Curated annotation (Swiss-Prot):
The keyword Cytoplasm does not apply. Belongs to the complex I NdhL subunit family. It is found in: Cellular thylakoid membrane. Keywords: Membrane, NAD, NADP, Plastoquinone, Quinone, Thylakoid, Translocase, Transmembrane, Transmembrane helix, Transport. This is NAD(P)H-quinone oxidoreductase subunit L. One of its GO terms (molecular function) is quinone binding.
Length: 84
């Protein structure tokens, strides 16, 4: 009886760990890189869906985006051009 409880507990903890890892790491990274690739080519429905997913997976976007900064940002180029 005790070993069955322990094995069930490990299964539940493992399932929570996998779901948490997907929610906090894998899906936000996928969305971030997808948006970097498709940013200038998205239609309005794709953009709306992505914004909804970003809102859903928001907790780690602040953390992840602080490490992955875009290299070719149009906003940065415009600021660099305006400052000269």
């Amino acid at each position: 009886m005790a070993s069955q409880f322990a094995s069930n507990s490990l299964l539940v903890l493992g399932a929570y760990g996998i779901i948490g890892f997907l929610y906090l790491v894998v899906i936000p990274l996928f969305l971030y890189f997808w948006m970097n690739i498709r940013w200038n080519f998205m239609n309005k429905f794709e953009r709306l869906c992505l914004y909804g997913l970003v809102f859903l997976f928001f907790p780690w976007f602040d953390f992840i985006c602080s490490f992955f900064k875009p290299k070719n940002s149009w906003a940065r180029r415009d600021l660099a051009i305006d400052s000269h």
